[in-house]
């Protein structure tokens, strides 16, 4: 099957789209990346999303409209990846769309029960592309008692398992998440959870203090010095004390967290603050390895992915934090994969599994009671593709 995976993450960089060919289904399926592209958000769209994410500034009218706007943007992004690959859109079998997370609440908070909301109307995508769309992947896992995250471990089992090596897959997107893929693989042996902020805090600090969307290659952070009192404040965040399975997001490490941090530590230089929150991401990752993984597994290889894997300062901090461990650290490209495309590929794989009526959550990662089939299916509007005017 030819499948397009569409991902818009917490970093708000844009829309990632991976066009892949998948042979078969289940953990033995074969996946080939044909083409990958990122379609950046225009400033107006990014501002609308940021407003929708803010409890103080959001409103239901905005979210309702944005749901349809994003659906159209996602559809256009699918058309773009097909155009760039010189691949006929009519030959596309399936689209897996994660959507844009507006709010994710994995645990009950007072009268608010566990819930999640991703938008980007699948009917718009299906209509514009005349292709079946699988969307809303997280809700069935939560219905089964899970946290709805992380969902990428199933795809990581397919793509990264190794006969002799115990591997850690560390994604550093807006949020960091890790998956343990043991060489002696069984579903229950796969551990996965969020490790805390990935790029989210760094990017927010960079935007506020330097008017830049991100710290390219970690060049600014490299000029600063880590401030211990600020790092201690960050490392005392309650999320780091929770046991897996667990997930987090902008609700805990977004604008409110950064506002509190900057107000509390105004006396320190901009460069030092950025260096410290970069170290916070590194230390939160290392903390979770030492607390929840390394006591149980001897790790041979740590494979970094996501935008944070291109931050040389962050990667060096991680290397220093894991220097005593006997494991190599590399990025996706070192083993023939793409850091940027990883999550979009994951949702193409999950869509393929849903199409074949296969469960694709990993209960040991999400905390769900059992394995379930993920996602909602939206069929194309035309029974005969020749009726479509596309």
UniProtKB/Swiss-Prot annotation:
* Keywords, ordered alphabetically: ATP-binding, Carbohydrate metabolism, Kinase, Nucleotide-binding, Transferase
Top-level taxon of the source organism? Bacteria
User: What residues does ATP bind to?
Assistant: 9-16
| UniProt-listed Enzyme Commission number(s) | 2.7.1.170
| Gene Ontology MF annotations | ATP binding; kinase activity; phosphotransferase activity, alcohol group as acceptor
Task: Provide a GO biological process annotation.
Answer: amino sugar metabolic process
Which class of enzymes does this protein belong to?
transferase
Q: Which CDD domains match?
A: ASKHA_NBD_ANMK
Known InterPro entries for this protein?
Anhydro_N_Ac-Mur_kinase, ATPase_NBD
Its pathway, per UniProt, is: Amino-sugar metabolism; 1,6-anhydro-N-acetylmuramate degradation; Cell wall biogenesis; peptidoglycan recycling
Its recorded reaction(s) are:
1,6-anhydro-N-acetyl-beta-muramate + ATP + H2O = N-acetyl-D-muramate 6-phosphate + ADP + H(+)
What this chain does, per the record? Catalyzes the specific phosphorylation of 1,6-anhydro-N-acetylmuramic acid (anhMurNAc) with the simultaneous cleavage of the 1,6-anhydro ring, generating MurNAc-6-P. Is required for the utilization of anhMurNAc either imported from the medium or derived from its own cell wall murein, and thus plays a role in cell wall recycling.
Q: Which family does it belong to?
A: Belongs to the anhydro-N-acetylmuramic acid kinase family.
Name of the featured protein: Anhydro-N-acetylmuramic acid kinase
Task: State the organism named in the record.
Answer: Bacillus cereus (strain B4264)
In the UniProt record, the gene name given for this protein reads anmK
